[in-house]
Amino acid sequence: MNSSGPGFAVLYRWRLHEGAEESFVSAWSRISELLLSKSGSLGSRLHRGPEGLWYSYAQWPSAEARDQAFARESVDPEAGRQMRAAIAESLPEIVLESVSDFMVLPKNDA
């Protein structure tokens, strides 16, 4: 555990078209894995919330790192199209500054 963490995080929120959840999760997962492995992302999580809202929390080393990653060509254009097709409504993103971080990631014993 660490009392301070990444200084930049973003919360994304969407409403999805009915029946598009599986397609969205697949596309979101593909893009998130590529951003993590190739574009400097520190990782992200996808959550389903109440009232049909979906949330993604993404961490980056800095706002500049995210801006640089998003300025490049899409990490997977087809997954991007698939994700956009599943979204009925995108709500404004919320930029967050980490103040204290005690999140523990499970160890992968595989």
Listing of model-derived features with the role each one plays in the protein:
Residues M1-F8, L42-Y55, A79-A110:
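Glycine-rich beta-strand-turn "strand-cap" elements at beta-sheet edges
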Residues N2-S3, A20-E22, I31-L34, S44-H47:
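Intrinsically disordered, low-complexity segments enriched in polar/charged residues with Gly/Pro
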Residues F8-R15, S44-E73:
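Short, well-ordered beta-strand segments in beta-rich or mixed alpha/beta enzyme
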Residues R15-S26:
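Short, surface-exposed ligand-recognition loops at beta-strand->loop->(often short) alpha-helix junctions
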Residues H17-G19, A63, V99:
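Generic structural motif
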Residues R30-L42, Q59-L96:
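An amphipathic, aromatic/His-enriched active-site/gating alpha helix that lines ligand/cofactor pockets
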